[in-house]
Amino acid sequence: MSDDKKDEEKLKKSDENFDDDSKYYEFDDTIKKVFEEEKAKEEDEDEEEIPQEKEGYQVKSQLLETEQNGLQPADLAKVMKSSFIEYAMSVIVSRALPDARDGLKPVHRRILYGMSELGMFHTAPHKKSARIVGDVLGKYHPHGDSSVYEAMVRMAQDFSLRYPLIDGHGNFGSIDGDEAAAMRYTEARMSKIAGVMVDGIKKNTVDFIDNYDGTEKEPTVLPSRFPNLLVSGTSGIAVGMATNIPPHNLGEIIDAVCALAKNPEITIDGLMEFVLAPDFPTGATIFNKAGLIEAYKTGRGSITMRAKANIQELANGKSKIIITEIPYEVKKTEIMEKIADHLKNKRIEGISDFRDESNRDGIRVVIDVKKNAVPEVILNTLYKLTRLQTNFSFNMIALVNGEPKLLNLKECLQVYLDHQIDVTRRRLQFDLEKDLARAHILEGLKICVENIDRVIEIIKKSKTDVDAQAKLCQTFSLSEIQAKAIVDMRLGRLTGLAIEKMNDELDQVNARIAEYRAILSSHEKLIELIIKELQEVKEAYGDKRRSEIRWDVMSSINNEDLIPQKEIVITLSSNNYIKRIDLEEYREQRRGGVGVSTVKTYQDDDIQDVVVANTHADLLIFTDEAKIYRVRGHEIPSGTKQSKGTPIVNIVPTIQKNEKVVKIICVTDYEESQSLITVTERGVIKKTNLKEYELIRKNGKYALSLLEDDHLIDVRVVDQDEEIFIAASNSRINRFNVADVREMGRVARGVGGIRLSDDDKVVSVSSSKDGAYIFSLGAKGYGKLSLVESYRKTKRNAKGVITLNEDKAGKLVYAAAVHGVEDLIIMTQSGIAIRISLRDINVIGRNAKGVKIINLKGRSDQIVGVAKIYDEDATDRELTKEEYIEVTKEIDIDLANE
């Protein structure tokens, strides 16, 4: 056996022997008992550490049924209930809710009273905020210093209070959400208007109570010579309730209090003639009158606050949104961060840059809008997605007689008015008693002066002051106070001038006493005094409203509501580039003018279609594959005369690459009496009720079924009693009744409208409602204006009659019925546009060759599009005598030939 194995055997044997305590050790009974108890205790502790199932736990408790060692039995549920109620009432009464009389919470009241006791009025120098906070903490407010300083900071912020009660010196925070500097760095004093809050507090106008340790006295309420609850507003969260009262304009609230004082029966509607709406320190715009009326009548309601912004148009076609005022209690940095987040997440598009240019003069947030974006839409989106527009919810709860109460507007004003009646009466009573005491002394001094020799004799013979006072009282029937005043009087008061002043003072004091008694004995005079004093406060501190009231604004508006209705020109290129230009940018030119460039042409891209529309109208976009899409006029990006435009796929993402837009029509109203006429290149016509196209969306639908070798070429909205004119490239126009075409479903194929040869195609469609004349224009710039009656009526699917000499005018590019007074915009392939008036074109016969309408730039240039500027009030022009002779002669010849 190896040495290692021997060692293992010895170790094993020793362990076995060690486990058998009785074999090697002998304990006496006492020691053994101690070890057994310790071992049992350790086993119990080990068992407690072992986790057990819930069922294994047994909670042992001992109920205390009688008083033991100073402990009294109590029901836990009752103790919890009473303790919570005490805590809740403490929060409600002593911390979170304001008193309806002065509009202050205890901490604000203690700050103002403490500062007034320190003499820190607006005329005194500023003192360290830490000194003020320490004084308030030590004497009145046994809570944390942060709560006192935060309340003090808020009262100094001109963006938190409409009329700040603290005049702060140093960093007291900002509207960006920056915190105030530590109280060891800032200084403060009472603002001028805060002095009005404590005015008269030394005249027993309010009740005082002991402070928390009984060493000081503090007021239960401040005199408050203006209605601070509504003027400054307040907010706070108590237990089971909260308050939220907005600030108001001082002048409006004082006028309402005066109106209530004059007419206690005035209604809330009557009071709202004075109190127009809240007036926030940050300005902004207020709307939602229904919510305001509800708030003033019930104490609960909501209004909407919206930032003030204006749109600035720039010379390069871009624009800026400039925000100058933001809603109440909204941090400017929060708005900036939200805008940045939405731009990053692409919830807001069309903004190229934004920045904060705010300074001491006020808020200025500048948002740069991209060239093709609509600033009104972007601004509305910002209102929806950021706190540039937010609601203020009224919850006008305040303490009335120490109990929380929901107040309406009249009740708020009534509580304050009752408080002022009490304060004013107590002040007058105090002044009356003070003047009575002064008059009493002056009357004693007057008796002294009238009997000066006798008084001096009595005083000289008296051994002490007390003896002199007693003899004076006995001799002249004076009171102790009068006698003491005589004894204490200096000899200088006996001069003639001093005696005269004393008599004048007595007269003045007696006059004031009479006035005080008259006011105190008459409720009407007391009310007049209160109104007078309130008006003095208004004149001293009143100012204009900061928040604008707009009851005509909806709280939730569509983007389109922000876009002005304007007449626009929509241009479409052959490569599906589209843009809109204000109609006003096209100036009228005389016939034969060269025109102005309206689009920068690119290789293989020419102007195809021109539509005069409205920003609030529907644009039905038809493609050659007979698909139809719908967009609004303002959704087409704005461009300049020289800009290329925007690919239409950016506006209608579902449009296919192989689709080519062939027609855009403007629809303002989907009337059931109207029909939509579609005409294909091969002369197929279809009539469908216009209502079937009302629900078309951007994803598109089919307008009709096409043959394989056919494409949609033109679309027209018509009434049932109209005549239709289909013009073909072979210079023929087919005139027939709309009623000849039966109404079909949206996806039907249609019937023949005009008979064509293989090389010909339809170029345009018009109707008799458009006027009594037909204007025809060829690709070479020649055209003419003729009477509709010059074109004989045929039938559907006929060849039609000739309108232009093709050799001279070229292929027909446009032929439509007109009144003869409209303006036309003519587009050339080279991108030139000219605006002409049909008034400048003489009416000639159908068989005439035509006149030069536009001078083209080079032989390769030709006319590709014509748009008529519609005038709803337009009527057919009257023929001149010469025109009448010519056209009627031709009509007679045509009739004779038939």
UniProtKB/Swiss-Prot annotation:
Keyword Isomerase: yes
One annotated Gene Ontology cellular component of this protein: DNA topoisomerase type II (double strand cut, ATP-hydrolyzing) complex
Principal location: cytoplasm
UniProt xrefs under PROSITE patterns: TOPO_IIA
Catalytic reactions on record: ATP-dependent breakage, passage and rejoining of double-stranded DNA
Keywords: ATP-binding, Cytoplasm, DNA-binding, Isomerase, Nucleotide-binding, Topoisomerase
Record-level GO BP terms: DNA topological change; DNA-templated DNA replication
InterPro entries registered for this protein in UniProt: GyrA (IPR005743), GyrA/parC_rep (IPR006691), Gyrase/topoIV_suA_C (IPR035516), Topo_IIA-like_dom_sf (IPR013760), Topo_IIA_A/C_ab (IPR013758), Topo_IIA_A_a_sf (IPR013757), Topo_IIA_dom_A (IPR002205), Type_II_DNA_Topoisomerases (IPR050220)
Domain Topo IIA-type catalytic: 97-562
SMART domains: TOP4c
Motif GyrA-box per record, residues: 589-595
Entry's localization field: Cytoplasm
Magnesium recorded as keyword: no
Annotated EC: 5.6.2.2
CDD domains reported in the protein's UniProt record: TOP4c
Top-level division of the source organism's lineage: Bacteria
Active-site positions on this chain: Y185 (o-(5'-phospho-dna)-tyrosine intermediate)
Task performed by this protein: A type II topoisomerase that negatively supercoils closed circular double-stranded (ds) DNA in an ATP-dependent manner to modulate DNA topology and maintain chromosomes in an underwound state. Negative supercoiling favors strand separation, and DNA replication, transcription, recombination and repair, all of which involve strand separation. Also able to catalyze the interconversion of other topological isomers of dsDNA rings, including catenanes and knotted rings. Type II topoisomerases break and join 2 DNA strands simultaneously in an ATP-dependent manner.
Family the UniProt entry places it in: Belongs to the type II topoisomerase GyrA/ParC subunit family.
Additional remark text: Few gyrases are as efficient as E.coli at forming negative supercoils. Not all organisms have 2 type II topoisomerases; in organisms with a single type II topoisomerase this enzyme also has to decatenate newly replicated chromosomes.
PANTHER family from the UniProt entry: DNA GYRASE SUBUNIT A, CHLOROPLASTIC_MITOCHONDRIAL, DNA GYRASE/TOPOISOMERASE SUBUNIT A
Name of the protein in its database record: DNA gyrase subunit A
Gene: gyrA
